[in-house]
Amino acid sequence: MEISMKHAAPKMTDSTPDTRMDLLLWRHAEAEDSTPDLKRKLTARGEKQARQMAEWIKQHAPKNLRIIASPAVRCQQTAKALDLPFSTDKRLGPDASVPDLLAAIDWPHGSTKERSVAVLVIGHQPTLGRTAALLLAGEEASWTIKKGAVWWFSNRVRQGETQTVLRAVMPPDSIR
């Protein structure tokens, strides 16, 4: 089931091509309860969650996926489970805001001239949940994304209209 939110896009000419951006929000897997916060590591269960979700992502996500992770150790470990190149962006740290996250990925256009872009963000609550709420409901709200889960959004501009669609929500306990 897909959920869609439509709104008017910035003025575009008839010659402007249709574009699409996929955004996957992946909350880091289960981590130790310790301090300092940036140094918290994944638990054994978290490592398993990260590996399972990484396999699902590799099977289902677009192939041109750009991966960006928070500098927190638990997010770095979650990203490494993919065994793919990724970058680190301090704007995605535990205290990130929704505007920080959206700026880091250049939502809804991506930082490319290609017609189709896909970005995977590995980050934290409450930022990921608040971002999901904004994309689907039009305003930030306190939505929760479960540890290790992925929420996949597609944003496209078609005939001058922007549409955001929720393509999938995948919690780690649903993958065996």
Task: State where each predicted segment sits.
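Non-DNA-binding regulatory cores of transcription-related proteins
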Residues: 112-113, 125-148, 163
